[in-house]
Amino acid sequence: MSTNSFDGSIVSSYLTTRMPPWAGVRQNVMGSSIDGRPVLPANSTTLTYETVSGTPLETAASAAASAAAATARGIVTDFAFLSPLASSAASRSSARDDKLTALLAQLDSLTRELNVVSQQLLDLRQQVSALKASSPPNAV
């Protein structure tokens, strides 16, 4: 079977990568689909996607999917490409942490102020209750 022929089956590494370790599947060994056809292992450098019917649109889509998978794999393994992105993400994370710390400090300050105001309100209620209790009923 040629890897470029699209004869109706969907071929992926799903069947070999999802098997439990006790099933004896090795990552560098060719697997097989339900109907016994070969499936490339999960650590293969090429993933091919075959289509159900061989229309030109599906063929182009499967070629694009294969190219996207290869590109994604290349990007993931290219640490030189990822390191500026990682440092940028780390600086954004640090800035977010600083903002969060400032917000938490403000929240703590507001909580203390709220406690003071709540205590003052409680004192005022007690004073009003004491005044009502000590004043004659018709004085209001």
Swiss-Prot record:
One Pfam family per UniProt: Adeno_PIX
Keywords: Capsid decoration protein, Capsid protein, Coiled coil, Host nucleus, Host-virus interaction, Virion, Virus entry into host cell
Highest rank taxon of the organism: Viruses
Membership in a protein family: Belongs to the adenoviridae hexon-interlacing protein family.
Gene Ontology MF terms: hexon binding
Location of this chain's protein in the cell: Virion; Host nucleus
GO biological process, one term: symbiont entry into host cell
Coiled-coil parts of chain: 100-127
One GO term describing the cellular component: host cell nucleus
InterPro entries xref list: Hexon_assoc_IX (IPR005641)
Primary role: Structural component of the virion that acts as a cement protein on the capsid exterior and forms triskelion structures consisting of three molecules that stabilize three hexon trimers at the center of each icosahedral facet and fixes the peripentonal hexons. Dispensable for assembly. During virus entry, recruits the anterograde motor kinesin-1 to the capsid docked at the nuclear pore complex thereby subjecting the docked capsid to a pulling force.
Additional record remark: This protein is only encoded by mastadenoviruses, and may therefore play a role in mammals tropism.
Protein name listed in UniProt: Hexon-interlacing protein
Keyword hit for Coiled coil: yes
Induction conditions: Expressed in the intermediate phase of the viral replicative cycle.
Signal peptide (residue range): none
UniProt free text on domains: Three N-terminal domains of hexon-interlacing protein form triskelions between hexon capsomers.
Organism of provenance: Human adenovirus C serotype 5
Keyword Cell membrane: no
Oligomeric and partner information: Homotrimer. Interacts with hexon protein; this interaction tethers the hexons together. Self-interacts with adjacent proteins. Interacts with kinesin light chain KLC1; this interaction leads to capsid disruption at the nuclear pore complex during virus entry into host cell.
Disulfide linkage: none
